[in-house]
Design a protein with these regions (language model features):
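Terminal-region recognition feature
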Residues: 1-11, 29, 34, 135, ...
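Glycine- (often His-adjacent) and acidic-residue-rich active-site loop
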Residues: 1-26, 42, 70-72, 153
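A general structural signal for well-ordered alpha-helical segments in protein cores
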Residues: 20, 80, 89-92, 123, ...
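CoA-thioester-processing core
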Residues: 22-29, 37, 43-97, 110, ...
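Well-ordered beta-strand positions
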Residues: 55, 94, 98-100, 106, ...
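C-terminal long alpha-helix characteristic of the crotonase
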Residues: 57-63, 113-160, 171-173, 190-196
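Helix-loop "lid/cap" segments that line or gate small-molecule binding pockets
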Residues: 95, 107, 147, 151, ...
């Protein structure tokens, strides 16, 4: 958000935005299961990244949540679609529309995390899961992953549309208010935009 505030974009890229959709594609296309190890915050874009991973293991001290609408941003592709698949439409809307933080235990109970354990055991557990996966047929795993991803591939197109919309939206006063408030550590005042 600081980069976006200071320069109007997310850093050097062809479009001017951080090419997060390319990162999403890499996570989905790598022909092996991916494991998100969450130790700290999985908020906003980090929350979407863990959703994109095939498995999520979290430290019991981890915090999850969305903050896009709070800072004048959104992920209307994988961030909404995969969340609704994981937790149900109503819960996904709650997570996005209210921008609350929730615990690793809540993430586990809602189906967003596969396992929660003490932070000092996280690295060892992720390694154990990876070692277990390495004993399995790589071709079978690849085909299984492709099968899971094919069912949600339409979210990629929606995400590309949303990414273009975000680029346009990021140039508005409303988006600037969200970014400025975030960087100034204050609540944004979006009252002037209620009629949109």
């Amino acid at each position: 958000q600081k980069q976006r505030m200071e320069t109007g974009d997310y850093g050097p890229s062809e479009s001017g935005l951080f090419e997060v959709d390319s990162l999403h594609r890499v996570i989905r296309d790598v022909p092996k299961p991916t494991i998100a190890a969450v130790n700290g915050f999985a908020i906003g874009g980090g929350h979407v990244l863990h959703l994109l991973c095939d498995l999520t293991i979290a430290a019991d001290s981890a915090t999850f949540g969305q903050n896009g609408p709070r800072v004048g941003s959104f992920d209307a592709g994988f961030g909404t679609g995969l969340m609704a698949r994981a937790v149900g439409e109503k819960r996904a809307r709650e997570i996005w529309f209210l921008c609350r933080k929730y615990s690793a235990q809540q993430a586990f109970e809602w189906g967003l995390a596969n396992k929660v354990l003490p932070a000092d055991q996280l690295r060892k557990e992720v390694r154990a899961w990876a070692d277990e996966i390495l004993k399995l047929s790589p071709t079978a795993l690849k085909v299984l992953k492709q099968s899971f991803n094919t069912d949600t591939e339409h979210f990629a197109g929606i995400g590309q549309m949303a990414h273009s919309s975000l680029k346009m939206f990021s140039e508005t006063a409303e988006a600037r208010e969200g970014i400025t408030a975030f960087n100034e550590k204050r609540s944004p005042d979006f009252s002037a935009y209620r009629g949109n």
